[in-house]
């Protein structure tokens, strides 16, 4: 939700309050997906729990219309994010299970790009809507979106996932592997820098005088190139290992976040930085998701994706979003974005030195 921070700012919340509220989406990812992931792995009924989580996400969000204080919005956002944060890992697990069964792992990016297309449409439309109708129009648009997600859950065929092995194995031996720890740590460092981006980028641009339409356009540029990289990923994965893709993505992240902080007054540089989103999110996400699927399989696949979401987007995102809010108070927006480039820089060396696997995606 690239404009949610702007809506919260319109309610006269300060940077620390906005950071705390937006970090609820990341904090909920630490524990909520693991509960539903465990239930889904036990039953194999992923679609059933996608329906449940999307239903409660929609119902709870309606409470935002009667909330204008920090405490009230905190309660609504926390309750809603518990369910919405659980939907995506379940959908990822279902998708990867289907692709793995057909030995078409590299096709994941072609499916994921539809989410990016939806983001572009939403970013452009909402930017214009906010310019014309004000920030409050955002909550009506988001309510409609939540309802559509709920309806789409019922279009999915009621298929139960059958695991290739019936033996119940503990997940702890997988979690204790050095390569798994290294992968999750480097992913968390990458997402920490993005936590700052997702929470404060729109506010940063608005404070620099950019219009809602311009902000929407910049977000859309990033996601447009994200779609392009998704289309190219099968070819990229046929030539590079997943580790190489992750390292290249981390390198681009260092450059991107420094540029955002140092040259926010240059639209050309900002566009260049947004183009790098293709690597810092697009290729990085595809490669990390497939490595997680490589380590966590069969009856652990939903929990594997949930743990990935919890540690990277949960812990990592919360550190970046909440910690970023505190840093902005003392260092300012521009300096905080430049400093955030240190996180993927560390992640690069953690991954380079600690991940030894040469695993490549299965192609078909």
Place the predicted regions along the sequence by residue:
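Structural signature of the two symmetry-related core transmembrane helices
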Residues: 48-62, 143, 244-259
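Helix-to-loop junctions at the C-terminal end of transmembrane segments
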Residues: 31-45, 130-131, 228-241, 328-329
């Amino acid at each position: 939700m690239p404009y949610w921070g702007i809506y919260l700012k319109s309610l006269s919340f300060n940077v620390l309050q906005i950071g705390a509220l937006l970090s609820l989406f990341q904090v909920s990812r630490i524990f909520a997906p693991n509960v539903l992931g465990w239930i889904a792995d036990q039953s194999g009924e992923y679609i059933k729990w996608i329906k449940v989580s999307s239903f409660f996400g929609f119902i709870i969000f309606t409470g935002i219309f009667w909330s204008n204080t920090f405490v009230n919005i905190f309660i609504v956002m926390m309750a809603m994010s518990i369910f919405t944060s659980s939907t995506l890992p379940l959908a990822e697990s279902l998708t990867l299970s289907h692709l793995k069964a057909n030995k078409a792992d590299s096709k994941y990016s072609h499916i994921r790009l539809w989410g990016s297309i939806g983001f572009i449409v939403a970013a452009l439309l909402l930017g214009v809507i906010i310019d014309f109708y004000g920030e409050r129009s955002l909550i009506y648009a988001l309510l409609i979106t939540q309802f559509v997600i709920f309806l789409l859950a019922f279009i999915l065929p009621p298929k139960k996932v059958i695991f290739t092995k019936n033996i119940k194995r503990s997940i702890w031996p997988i979690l204790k592997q050095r390569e798994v720890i290294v992968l999750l740590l480097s992913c968390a460092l990458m997402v920490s820098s993005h936590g700052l981006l997702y929470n404060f980028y729109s506010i940063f641009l608005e404070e620099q005088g950019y219009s809602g339409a311009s902000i929407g356009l910049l977000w859309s540029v990033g996601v447009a190139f994200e779609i392009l990289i998704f289309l190219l990923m099968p070819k990229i994965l046929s030539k590079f290992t997943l580790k190489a893709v992750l390292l290249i993505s981390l390198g681009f992240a260092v450059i991107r976040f420094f540029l955002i902080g140092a040259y926010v007054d240059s639209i050309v540089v900002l566009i260049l930085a947004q183009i790098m989103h293709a690597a810092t999110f697009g290729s990085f996400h595809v490669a990390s998701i497939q490595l997680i699927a490589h380590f966590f399989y069969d009856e652990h696949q939903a929990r594997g994706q949930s743990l990935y979401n919890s540690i990277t987007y949960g812990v990592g995102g919360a550190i970046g979003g909440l910690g970023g809010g505190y840093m902005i108070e003392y260092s300012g927006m521009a300096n905080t974005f430049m400093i955030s480039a240190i996180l993927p820089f560390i992640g690069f060396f953690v991954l380079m030195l600690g991940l030894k696997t040469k695993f490549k995606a299965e192609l078909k």
